[in-house]
């Protein structure tokens, strides 16, 4: 009986906790629509500039993979300067650490480009922010 009560207490303690965040992207650029704060939650939602939207399963799986793929680079705190012709700057925070880069950074890793593409896709198609 005591064991059952302990198990029930452990299960209930986890109930009601919000799902963890996967990552936070802050994007800045020359026009108002370029400036964005996007928080992706493991619970299947994304918050763009303070407004929450549901995130479909495919995009959620993509976000989870991006988090895994970017973890080592975030742990290192990689900061790539913006290139001469760049427009958009990205700051990414996640549990593993943070990273910064620009859309025209030299020697930009493919994972950073995938994150930029994911951000553009979610911003336009989920959050309905046209750039």
Give the positions of each predicted feature.
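Positively charged n-region of N-terminal signal peptides that target proteins for export
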Residues: 1-4
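Short, well-ordered, aromatic-rich surface patches in folded extracellular/luminal domains
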Residues: 16-22, 26, 73, 77-131
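Post-signal-peptide N-terminal segment of Sec-exported extracytoplasmic proteins
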Residues: 34-61
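Extracytoplasmic/periplasmic, Sec-exported soluble proteins
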Residues: 32, 55-58, 103, 107-110
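Mature extracytoplasmic domains of secretory-pathway proteins
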Residues: 51-81
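C-terminal motif of bacterial Sec signal peptides marking the signal peptidase cleavage site
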Residues: 12-14
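Short, surface-exposed coil-to-beta transition loops
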Residues: 31-37, 85-87
């Amino acid at each position: 009986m005591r064991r059952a009560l302990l198990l029930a207490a452990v299960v209930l303690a986890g109930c009601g906790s919000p799902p963890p965040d996967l990552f936070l992207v802050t994007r800045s650029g020359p026009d108002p629509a370029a400036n964005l704060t996007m928080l992706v939650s493991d619970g299947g939602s994304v918050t763009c500039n303070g407004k929450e939207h549901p995130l479909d399963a495919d995009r959620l799986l993509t976000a989870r993979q991006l988090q895994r793929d970017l973890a080592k680079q975030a742990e290192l705190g990689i900061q790539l300067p913006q290139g001469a012709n760049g427009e958009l700057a990205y700051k990414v925070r996640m549990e593993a650490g943070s990273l910064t880069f620009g859309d025209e950074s030299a020697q930009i890793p493919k994972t950073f480009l995938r994150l930029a593409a994911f951000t553009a896709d979610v911003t336009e198609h989920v959050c309905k922010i046209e750039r």
